[in-house]
Amino acid sequence: MTVELGFHYDEKVDLLLKSASACAKEKNFDTAISVMKEALENIWISDVSFSPANIAKIIPYFQKAGRYSDGVAFADTYLIPKLIEDYDQSGSTDRAFICLYVGKVHEKLALNAKREKIKDDEMFFSNKAAEMLSAYTKLMEIGRIEDLKEEYQQMLAVFGNDYGKWPDTVLKKFEAILK
């Protein structure tokens, strides 16, 4: 049996992300925005996970292109709705990551507002980013407990109901749900 290890990536998205970065480096921000929009369309259908940085990368391009309001509108009407569209059908851990990604978008919006010296927007987006980070942390803990409860059922089948017969390391792992 051969096991192949390697890094799986989406070549098309990777090339689009690099192209957008190159356009931005040349200060061609409108083209960078167009390329990033295409990259995002491909990210949504890719079987590869992308970092929050890749998802939110488009936001600063709007500000640098002198299109601050367009960036806010793009985030509000497209980017954030796209990120949260599966929220209600997701488990706690997936919901946590949705919150993380939305929080990163808000961080970029806050940075744009800071650069534009729009204090009210900066405060608003910073607060939203903090809310999303808090939700991420809480949902990750809920997801951890849910996973433990699932695994606990398997441990019951292996070790039985008498916790005195369970190994100490296993008991320690399940402390959070045995209380």
Stretches found by the model and what they are:
Residues 7-38:
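Alpha-helical segment of the N-proximal tetratricopeptide repeat
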Residues 8-18, 48-55, 95-98, 102, ...:
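Generic helix N-cap/helix-start motif at coil->alpha-helix transitions
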Residues 30, 34-64, 82-90:
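Short, charge-rich amphipathic alpha-helical segments embedded
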Residues 36, 42-46, 75-86, 113, ...:
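Alpha-helical junction/boundary sensor with strong preference for TPR arrays
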